[in-house]
Regions:
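Active-site/ligand-binding-proximal alpha/beta "capping" segment
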Residues: 153-187, 270, 274
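Histidine/lysine/aspartate-rich catalytic loop segments that bind and position anionic ligands
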Residues: 127-131, 135-171, 203
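Non-catalytic positions within long, well-ordered alpha-helices that form the structural scaffold/packing
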Residues: 82-85, 182, 201
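Zn-dependent metallopeptidase/amidohydrolase metal-coordination segment
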Residues: 191-229
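A short, charged, Gly/Pro-tolerant segment at domain boundaries
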Residues: 258-294
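His/Asp/Glu-rich mid-to-C-terminal helical/loop segments that flank catalytic regions of hydrolases
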Residues: 218-265
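A cross-taxon signal for low-complexity, glycine/charged-rich
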Residues: 297-299
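Metabolite-binding pocket within alpha/beta catalytic cores that recognizes anionic/polar moieties
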Residues: 2-136, 291-295
Length: 299
């Protein structure tokens, strides 16, 4: 294992959810221990090449699945990827289906989120620097299109768009909750994509989710209610498909043009530069230097 160095760079970050703890075909792998101003990420970062493309892989729950959704240090995870030069993040997540048409084993590429989390810090900007980023379209359309093409190429049953509802967990929903979420128009349900997507936007990273449907939550009248065992059974098949999808998508993801995601902070920071606490300004330098240049003489 090595510590992060100046040469440790990647353009694409992959955050692996339940069942996805590595990237198939990754070569020249280095295991990096990345320190951030926001603490330690969920695990070490695997940096390597996938068909010549530099990839940074981070296991969201840690290898061996040690960290529950409420305990994940989302800020450290996103900051760590940003510090390695990542500009585009692909999230791979196990989800429950909230629609009859989305069957276990299907792939969903959500384009909207509903945040029902309760215990999580959802911003980098607090304690003296305030920012309000636009989040009406939380998923990078260009990145999503590249993933859609790859899903078709590998023969996945894929659903374009949809609403991912993120609950706190770690318990699964009650039937009453599950039925309510269906009335709201939810497509899938999970526990991890928020605040992850919000923080990616604040870090000016393109973000998109590959959601792997494993079950029907607990709303379905004729299907078994969700259990860990049922999730793992379907997940083993889904992960094989997800690895093929990711590898197929890489060339197109690399070619994704610069978009508004990478300019999210342009007019978002409202705090006057001369009122920013110096220590906080230094802490957020990686995120805000592009839009709030450091004045000469300020350390």
């Amino acid at each position: 294992m090595t510590r992060q160095g100046n040469r440790a760079r990647a353009d694409i970050g992959i955050i692996g959810g339940s069942g996805l703890y590595d990237v198939e075909g990754l070569q020249k792998v280095k295991e990096l221990s990345v320190k951030t101003p926001f603490g330690v990420p969920s695990d070490t970062v695997l940096l390597g090449e996938l068909d010549g493309i530099r990839i940074a892989f981070l296991s969201r729950h840690g290898r061996g699945h040690r960290v529950n959704p409420s305990e994940i240090n989302y800020r450290a995870n996103i900051y760590a990827l940003k510090s390695l030069g990542v500009r585009r993040v692909i999230s791979v997540s196990a989800v429950g289906s909230m629609k009859e048409s989305i069957k276990p084993g299907d792939v969903v590429l959500p384009d909207q989120f509903i945040d029902l989390t309760k215990r999580r810090v959802s911003t980098f900007f607090e304690g003296g620097i305030v920012a309000h980023v636009a989040f009406g379209d939380p998923v990078c359309a260009s990145l999503g299109a590249a993933l859609l093409d790859a899903a078709h190429t590998v023969g996945a049953t894929v659903h374009r768009g949809g609403v991912y509802i993120c609950i706190e967990g770690p318990q699964f929903s009650t039937k009453g909750e599950s039925r309510l979420y269906r009335q709201w128009g939810a497509s899938v349900i999970g526990m991890t994509n928020l605040p992850e997507a919000k923080l990616a936007r604040e870090a000016e990273l393109c973000y998109a989710t590959v959601a792997l449907a494993t079950d029907y939550d607990c709303w379905h009248e004729t299907e078994q209610a969700v259990t860990v065992d049922s999730i793992l059974t379907t997940l083993r098949q889904n992960v094989v498909l997800a690895k093929r999808l990711l590898r197929t998508a890489m060339p197109a993801v690399t070619d994704v043009k610069s978009c508004n995601c990478q300019r999210a902070l342009q007019d978002a920071i409202i705090t006057a530069p001369d009122r920013m606490p110096a220590s906080l300004r230094r802490k957020l330098a990686l995120l805000i230097d592009r839009v709030v240049p450091v004045k000469k003489g300020i350390q």
